[in-house]
Swiss-Prot record:
Functional summary from the UniProt entry: Core component of nucleosome. Nucleosomes wrap and compact DNA into chromatin, limiting DNA accessibility to the cellular machineries which require DNA as a template. Histones thereby play a central role in transcription regulation, DNA repair, DNA replication and chromosomal stability. DNA accessibility is regulated via a complex set of post-translational modifications of histones, also called histone code, and nucleosome remodeling.
Name used for this protein in its record: Histone H2A.1
Any matching Pfam family: Histone_H2A_C
Cellular component aspect of the GO annotation: nucleosome; nucleus
GO biological process, alphabetically ordered: heterochromatin formation
Native source species: Triticum aestivum
Domain topic, free-text comment: Contains 2 SPKK motifs which may interact with the minor groove of A/T-rich DNA sites. Phosphorylation of this motif may regulate DNA binding. This motif is reiterated in both termini of histone H1 and in the N-terminus of sea urchin histones H2B, but its presence in the C-terminus seems to be unique to plant H2A.
Span(s) of short sequence motif SPKK motif 1: 128-131
Family annotation (Gene3D superfamilies): Histone, subunit A (1.10.20.10)
Lineage of origin: Eukaryota, Viridiplantae, Streptophyta, Embryophyta, Tracheophyta
Motif (SPKK motif 2): 137-140
GO molecular function: DNA binding; protein heterodimerization activity; structural constituent of chromatin
Length: 146
């Protein structure tokens, strides 16, 4: 018989494991209580907040990993984080007021500053055959002939 003194104890299962999360639910709950955001904190609030934070982190890291791969790098640096966040419309709006240290700026050249097309390039464009666009679809033309 397993009594109070000795015996087999069950392994503790954390709330993060129960929720299937990597982020620490207990620690987030402790921060919510210690931060005095409200008098009381519900039991589901830290779980939900941990899930939201984990989703946002995964989203940013995936985009930053893609940016690193585009730059032929295997390590994510702050520059890749900035490119990921600023090139994504929703994340850019969410983190509009955030400055990422050592992130740099988004590359942008005003079209006025770009060099004008050379006459040779303009002639090439003029000589290339353009497709004729008609307003009616081919099916409508057949129906109109009958």
């Amino acid at each position: 018989m397993a009594g109070r003194k000795g015996g087999d104890r069950k392994k503790a299962v954390t709330r993060s494991v129960k929720a299937g999360l990597q982020f620490p639910v207990g620690r987030i709950g402790r921060y919510l209580k210690k931060g005095r955001y409200a008098q009381r904190v519900g039991s589901g609030a830290p779980v939900y907040l941990a899930a939201v934070l984990e989703y946002l982190a995964a989203e940013v890291l995936e985009l930053a990993g893609n940016a690193a791969k585009d730059n032929k790098k295997t390590r994510i640096i702050p520059r890749h984080l900035l490119l990921a966040v600023r090139n994504d419309q929703e994340l850019g709006r969410l983190l509009a007021g955030v400055t990422i240290a050592h992130g740099g700026v988004i590359p942008n050249i005003n079209s006025v500053l770009l060099p004008k097309k050379s006459p040779a390039a303009a002639e090439k464009e003029a000589k290339s055959p353009k497709k004729k666009t008609s307003t009616k679809s081919p099916k409508k033309k057949v129906a109109a002939k009958e």
